[in-house]
């Protein structure tokens, strides 16, 4: 049962379980990524893992430089410290289930990010980075290759 729906820019997050529901063991949410949506910048988690299970469409995750396509019924595990991000490069909306262990990331993070992204105009990147860091998501700029 959906507890709460949060619109974060173009991505929709539907929370199913949060820390209070699971004695802190897991948080679980579905997220829907429209075709061509702007998605989170590459980042890593300091204190939790994330497991993604594909529900519809195909998302392309980049985990530590490796591209992994996640379709319905497929999974991707993102360990602590692994730099990752995702995109929807296909022609249909994509939906996946995310499980956070332990439950250190909840709806409040997405609400704070939504305030920044939904404010209109270009997002305040500095504020966004501060909110991410506050919740243990560390922005990671891609390494530039030497010319």
Spans of model-derived segments:
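Short, charged/polar surface micro-motifs in flexible loops or helix N-caps
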Residues: 21-23, 34-38, 58-60, 83, ...
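Ligand-binding loop in jelly-roll beta-barrel domains
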Residues: 80-107
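Acidic/histidine-enriched, glycine/proline-rich intrinsically disordered or flexible terminal extensions
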Residues: 112-147
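Structural signal for conserved beta-strand scaffold positions within catalytic alpha/beta enzyme cores
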Residues: 7, 15, 98, 139-141
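Structural motif
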Residues: 12, 51, 58-60, 67, ...
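Short, conserved beta-strand element in jelly-roll/cupin
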Residues: 30-34, 44-62, 99-101
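A short glycine-rich, His/Asp/Glu-containing loop-to-beta-strand
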Residues: 6-42, 49
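Short acidic-glycine-tyrosine-enriched beta hairpin
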Residues: 65-83
């Amino acid at each position: 049962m959906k507890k709460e729906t949060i619109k974060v820019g173009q991505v929709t997050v539907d929370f199913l379980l949060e820390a209070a529901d699971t004695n802190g063991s897991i948080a679980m949410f579905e997220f829907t990524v429209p075709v061509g949506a702007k998605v989170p910048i590459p980042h890593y988690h300091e204190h939790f893992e994330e497991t993604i299970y594909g529900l519809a469409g195909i998302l392309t995750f980049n985990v530590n430089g490796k591209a992994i396509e996640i379709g319905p019924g497929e999974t991707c595990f993102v360990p602590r410290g692994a730099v990752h991000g995702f995109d929807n490069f296909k022609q249909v909306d994509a939906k996946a289930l995310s499980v956070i262990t332990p439950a250190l990331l909840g709806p409040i993070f997405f609400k704070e990010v939504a305030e920044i992204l939904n404010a209109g105009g270009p997002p305040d990147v500095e504020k966004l980075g501060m909110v991410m860091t506050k919740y243990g998501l560390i922005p990671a700029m891609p390494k530039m290759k030497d010319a």
